[in-house]
């Protein structure tokens, strides 16, 4: 395990801290993971952990970002689904299921943590890019895309933090939400005429 010394490149020490923190946050959650526990797992003092990540929220955000980036790379390099926005959405949600506890805790902390807001902003932009492509493929051209996107975002956010068991393929949930949101947006538009 890289020690916090000048003989080990900073990037390796920082990566070791992040790997240890990610494992602890995943298994123990935010509340039960301390900076001291992360330092102990890596073999450095808590102050050394804080040198790389100034706050526990920064470390937590970096852990969530690492999970998202690894999932995104997997998705974008998978020839079977890369370029298919529907399949990419389903796969990202599938890969995030084991981390729902972390997502719940992140949502609780977001109001107080710029770092967490930034990470979730990136995740939401990625989801929205794919979601808009799915909507564009299925919705009439005059549907209120903003309303449809907002409804779908609420669903995706709920799925990321839900404690309910997922008992069917995620593609079914995506189809249901997109179809329902498009239907509601179309019906609202028709009522206003």
Show the residue positions of the predicted features.
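Amphipathic alpha-helical packing segments from all-alpha helical-bundle domains
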Residues: 72, 95, 114-140, 146-150, ...
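Helix-turn-helix
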Residues: 12, 16, 20-58, 62
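N-terminal intrinsically disordered/low-complexity leader segments
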Residues: 1-12, 23, 189-193
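Hydrophobic alpha-helical connector segments
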Residues: 62, 73-98, 149
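Cytochrome P450 catalytic-core helices
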Residues: 156
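Short, basic, alpha-helical segments at the C-terminal edge of helix-turn-helix-like DNA-binding modules
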Residues: 65-71
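Amphipathic alpha-helical segments used for helix-helix packing
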Residues: 95-121, 161-164
